[in-house]
Amino acid sequence: MSLATLDTAQHPSLPSASETLFKAKAAKKLSFEQIAQHIGRNEVATAAIFYGQAKASPEDIEKLSGLLTIPYDALEERLSGFPDRGRSVEMPPKEPLIYRLYEIVQNYGYAYKAVLNEKFGDGIMSAISFSTKVEKETDADGNNWAVITLRGKWLPFSRF
């Protein structure tokens, strides 16, 4: 199994905790799925903690500290603040997989908007009251497919 690692030269805007977490993850040879199971979170949410895009709870910090053998105080100091979200990727993204996700929004964004507006009315899908998951699906011919589910609370625009 190949593991996600971090090259800090390619991600200079990530918080200092990211490098610490990724080094420990590599040393322990753990996947995000394994770490997520240990801390009781979704694997995408767990990866978001590593990239500084999600807030870690005190319980998350305690479990990460034990699993990754990182002193609790060092992790708590770096992970207990509020994340500075949205700064980890330059726009448009250059990394091919992240660019494909960006391209999906470019190509289908207005189609998603139209269908969502027809189904729910004038509003937005929350990225705060939100969950996501990634699954692997294999078809009858043996082709692998990525299935990404986005689940956000619908927030109607207020009339004022």
From Swiss-Prot:
Q: Which Gene3D superfamilies match?
A: Cyanate lyase, C-terminal domain, lambda repressor-like DNA-binding domains
User: Residues in the active site?
Assistant: R100, E103, S126
Q: What is this protein called?
A: Cyanate hydratase
Which Gene Ontology MF annotations are present? cyanate hydratase activity; DNA binding
Q: GO annotations under biological process?
A: cyanate metabolic process
Mind telling me which InterPro entries this protein's record contains?
Answer: Cyanase, Cyanate_lyase_C, Cyanate_lyase_C_sf, Lambda_DNA-bd_dom_sf
**Recorded catalytic activity of this chain's protein:** cyanate + hydrogencarbonate + 3 H(+) = NH4(+) + 2 CO2
Organism from which the protein derives: Aspergillus niger (strain ATCC MYA-4892 / CBS 513.88 / FGSC A1513)
E.C. designation(s): 4.2.1.104
